[in-house]
Amino acid sequence: MATHKLLLLPGDGIGPEVMGEVKRLIDWLNSAGIAKFETDTGLVGGSAYDAHKVSISEGDMAKALAADAIIFGAVGGPKWDAVPYEVRPEAGLLRLRKDLGLFANLRPAVCYPALADASSLKREAVEGLDIMIVRELTGGVYFGEPKTITDLGNGQKRAIDTQVYDTYEIERIARVAFDLAKKRKNKVTSMEKRNVMKSGVLWNEVVTQVHKREYPDVTLEHQLADSGGMMLVKWPKQFDVIVTDNLFGDMLSDIAAMLTGSLGMLPSASLGEVDVKSKKRKALYEPVHGSAPDIAGKGLANPIAMISSFGMALRYSFDMGALADKVDAAIAAVLASGLRTADIKSEGTTAASTTQMGEAILKELQKLHA
């Protein structure tokens, strides 16, 4: 049995609590002989700043580069609001993405039947929802140069951000989306603003070319990003895989997140390119929710997004799709039983702590694997 190297980076706030539930699951998989994971732990974000005055140390970056996958908790909090910008907690995550070459962000939005009434939309609009947003992560307006604020005099300033995309960046993110669609419902919707942005014109052109040349059997639709946002809240189940740029992906994935009822439910994956020789890719998996410092240490955090993120690691880094399916099924079974953490609690359901939810999911997984 192959040994897989995992680096656990719990981070700040509720990060260590929810990571503890993933570690419980990993330990059981190892002891049951189902998989063989070798885990190491490091500091990132505010915890790294407190220890080393950086957002991630060189030692932990080296661990990250050597790992088969990174499981990441959350970073940030008011405690570090005044630290220098270049070592702010979020800079640790940005460096991980940059140094590992993580260009594709996968954000599934799945609505479990037991939580359909927790969504802001009607049950019929979201029940059975299962969409995947593929966001380009390393290009676009967040990284384009120049990025400046200039003093024009007379009390006036000018801010400049630059939206930049090269053909290869669009091609590789398009391939990720099409490859995912082939394993799902075989449909990709590409979203941009070609009506007002030159980068949108190129995006549309390149995605169309990749589709025609390499994936003619996959259905491709194009939609303006603002219209796409409207349709996400009107009838989200029309979508399967949505592929879009960094800025629009940031916005659209957060819109999709709230369709499911709680940010505490949603995982994500950030993937690099497949290495030609090893056939492996660098990858980081993290929950969509933040560090929630207001509830840290109280046992109130929902560990489902963190556990689901580990499930994505099983699927995309270790080719353990069947085991990932069982993790998803275990979560669905626990929710169907009426167990709820505070963020998804409703009348007639049973309140659970972080640990109780994690233990319940592990018990269901053990049943499914018996």
From Swiss-Prot:
Keyword terms, alphabetized: Amino-acid biosynthesis, Branched-chain amino acid biosynthesis, Cytoplasm, Leucine biosynthesis, Magnesium, Manganese, Metal-binding, NAD, Oxidoreductase
Any GO molecular function: 3-isopropylmalate dehydrogenase activity
Broad enzyme group: oxidoreductase
InterPro entries: IsoCit/isopropylmalate_DH_CS, IsoPropMal-DH-like_dom, Isopropylmalate_DH
Pfam families: Iso_dh
Location, primary (coarse class): cytoplasm
Protein residues bound to substrate: 97, 107, 135, 226
UniProt function note: Catalyzes the oxidation of 3-carboxy-2-hydroxy-4-methylpentanoate (3-isopropylmalate) to 3-carboxy-4-methyl-2-oxopentanoate. The product decarboxylates to 4-methyl-2 oxopentanoate.
Gene: leuB2
Binding site for Mg(2+): 226, 250, 254
EC number assigned by the record: 1.1.1.85
Cofactor(s) this protein cannot do without: Mg(2+); Mn(2+)
Keyword S-adenosyl-L-methionine appears in the UniProt entry: no
Residues engaged in binding NAD(+): 77-90, 290-302
Cofactor note: Binds 1 Mg(2+) or Mn(2+) ion per subunit.
Localisation per UniProt entry: Cytoplasm
Protein family according to the UniProt entry: Belongs to the isocitrate and isopropylmalate dehydrogenases family. LeuB type 1 subfamily.
Catalytic reaction(s) noted: (2R,3S)-3-isopropylmalate + NAD(+) = 4-methyl-2-oxopentanoate + CO2 + NADH
PANTHER family per record: 3-ISOPROPYLMALATE DEHYDROGENASE (PTHR42979:SF1)
Organism: Bradyrhizobium diazoefficiens (strain JCM 10833 / BCRC 13528 / IAM 13628 / NBRC 14792 / USDA 110)
Gene Ontology biological process terms in this record: L-leucine biosynthetic process
SUPFAM superfamilies documented for this protein: Isocitrate/Isopropylmalate dehydrogenase-like
NCBIfam families in UniProt: leuB
Name recorded for this polypeptide: 3-isopropylmalate dehydrogenase 2
